Amino acid sequence: MKDIFLIRHGRQCSKLCNVDVSLDESGRKQAKLAGKRLISYQLEKLYCSQLIRAKETAEIIGHCVNLPVEEVADIEEIHFGGFTGKTDEQIRTEYAEFRKERASHKEDLPYPEGGECGRDVVKRVMPKIKQICQREENRVAIVTHGGVIRSVCADILHTGQENKLKFGIDLENTSF
């Protein structure tokens, strides 16, 4: 039986939706605290998304648990389409109809303008997680993103992607 810790990256510098930026000071502190908490779990391998905030989080954790970090392609955050690079206020204004439809809809809707839905994320990410599971290490951590963790958990728990925000997983930065 393998133990896999899915860890959300630390807090980032930008408040813009899904831009590839560094951690802020709080995010670095969060990563260090997560690393200290993970010492007792005796991780054997540490993986991360290729986005800067996940890499920086993993590097700080890796320093704490004395492990190198291996970057994994295709475990990046859900592609938010037209939301990318916009503030919350811009999204609320420009995509009010989409947000309303998404909140009331029973389907797992993709984000507008070429964005992904949860099923798309699962199709992209699960093959990578399965590859990690086939490796020899039994206790691993993967530093990734909130949308990825929610989508993967919804898939594993068979709750349906449309319910991924409702089943009570607290995904504060660096939670696992």
Predicted region positions:
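Phosphate-coordination/substrate-recognition cap region in phosphate-metabolizing enzymes
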Residues: 33-100
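Domain-level recognition of soluble alpha/beta enzyme cores
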Residues: 159-176
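Glycine-rich phosphate-binding loop signature in dinucleotide/nucleotide-binding domains
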Residues: 40-42, 132-138
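Short glycine/proline- and acidic residue-enriched helix-loop micro-motifs
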Residues: 99-120
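GST superfamily/GST-like fold recognition
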Residues: 146-150, 175
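Loop-to-helix element that buttresses phosphate recognition and phosphoryl-transfer chemistry
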Residues: 4-6, 10-57, 114-125
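A short acidic, helix-capping loop that chelates divalent metal ions and anchors anionic groups
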Residues: 13-17, 78-83, 109-113
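Generic beta-sheet signal
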Residues: 4, 136-146
